[in-house]
């Protein structure tokens, strides 16, 4: 239920160093139960935005405005997400060996999650005389909810600038201060080191 979603998403995660973390942004698919999702997003606008998948964009995501006269959501931000681009990224990371930039999961990963996150594959089709590639379910009626969750999580992470966070943790090299010019006394000592 939506109440359970709100409860989980507002739960604090306590990092081993004691830092308390909460979800700062989540995207919720508004393609189904649109009005219910819009109402939920209005009530929880501090951390969730409605989103909708699309495949006709030049960018990974785009902010739009809901234009629904008579709705409480009229004027609210809607995030349009190119699911195909994010699925391409996820698939590419799954093919990488474990390590930085790869797709890794917890060793006791739930089988249902694993099956859903890999429930689609990319196929080549001819549409209106043009050859296009698109993501489709591997089998009829295959659940792909967790894959969609990962797509929206990746879009939310991009909106928050997560990919560049590692740059903030790297301290810039401090420029070395030029050594001051030696004083006349220091020069005399260097030139006459054997005077002692």
Task: Name each model feature, range by range.
Residues 1-130, 172-196:
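Mg2+-dependent endonuclease catalytic cores in nucleic-acid-processing enzymes, primarily RNase H-like
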Residues 162-175:
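Charge-dense, low-complexity polyampholytic segments
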Residues 116-165:
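Extracellular low-complexity, Gly/Ser/Thr-rich intrinsically disordered linkers
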């Amino acid at each position: 239920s939506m109440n359970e979603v709100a409860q989980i998403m507002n739960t604090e995660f306590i990092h081993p160093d004691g830092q308390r973390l909460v979800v700062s942004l989540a995207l919720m698919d508004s393609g189904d139960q649109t009005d219910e999702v819009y109402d939920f997003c209005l009530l929880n606008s501090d951390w969730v935005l409605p989103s909708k998948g699309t495949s006709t964009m030049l960018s990974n995501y785009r902010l739009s405005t809901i234009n629904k006269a008579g709705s409480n959501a009229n004027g609210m931000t809607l995030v349009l997400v190119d699911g195909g681009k994010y699925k391409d990224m996820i698939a590419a990371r799954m093919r990488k060996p474990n390590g930085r930039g790869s797709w890794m999961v917890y060793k006791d990963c739930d089988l249902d999650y694993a099956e859903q996150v890999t429930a689609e594959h990319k196929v080549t089709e001819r549409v209106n005389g043009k050859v296009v590639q698109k993501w489709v379910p591997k089998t009829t009626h295959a659940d792909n909810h967790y894959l969609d969750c990962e797509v929206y999580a990746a879009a939310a992470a991009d909106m928050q600038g997560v990919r560049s966070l590692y740059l903030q943790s790297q301290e810039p090299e401090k420029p070395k201060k030029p050594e001051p010019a030696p004083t006349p006394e220091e020069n005399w000592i260097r030139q006459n080191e054997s005077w002692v």
